[in-house]
Amino acid sequence: MSLRIIIADDHPVVRIGTRAVIESSGVGRVVGEADSAQALMALLGSQPCDLLVTDYSMPGSPQADGFAMIGMIRRRFPDLPVLMLSVSNNLAILRMVLDSGVLGLVDKSSSMDELPQAIQAVYRGQPYISRSLRERVEAAGSWRMREGDGKPLSPR
């Protein structure tokens, strides 16, 4: 079975590249594209899909983007697996994105090979963080251990 995937990003080149990687890898087929949070919510309401690959920030959208958009998706489509593409270097925001119900997070500078792996993991319900983001998170964690009181934060 080929996964039905919706792509959302405000940059046409990113959508074109994401579609090309998804379809050439054989991991799924793109059944719809959106360039804003508003278009995404309308598309999700009308087009069945198995997984969403979305940008975090789509400025200029009449509806909210970022956390507000994720919240709307989680409320209206609670079982939809979400993989987020991001250029953010803010580890606090990235952690909050994952805490909000996004299962996968891929840095837009990641290798093209990583996207199909991330899609497969997220569809199976497994969390996925791209290598480059994982390395940054680990580096920040080890820095905090050296600079802090030596006690890691407890899980929530």
Residue ranges and their predicted role:
Residues D10, L85-N89, K108-S110:
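Conserved active-site segment of CheY-like receiver
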Residues P12-G32:
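Two-component/phosphorelay signaling modules centered on CheY-like receiver
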Residues E33-L51:
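Acidic, metal-coordinating helix/loop segments flanking the phosphotransfer/catalytic sites
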Residues G45-Q47, M72-L80, S100:
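Conserved phosphotransfer cores of two-component systems
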Residues L52, V82, L105-V106:
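Two-component signal transduction core modules
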Residues Q63-D79, R95:
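Short amphipathic alpha-helix used as the core "switch/output" element in two-component signaling
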Residues A92-D99, L103-R156:
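Short, flexible helix-to-coil linker/hinge segments that flank and couple to helix-turn-helix
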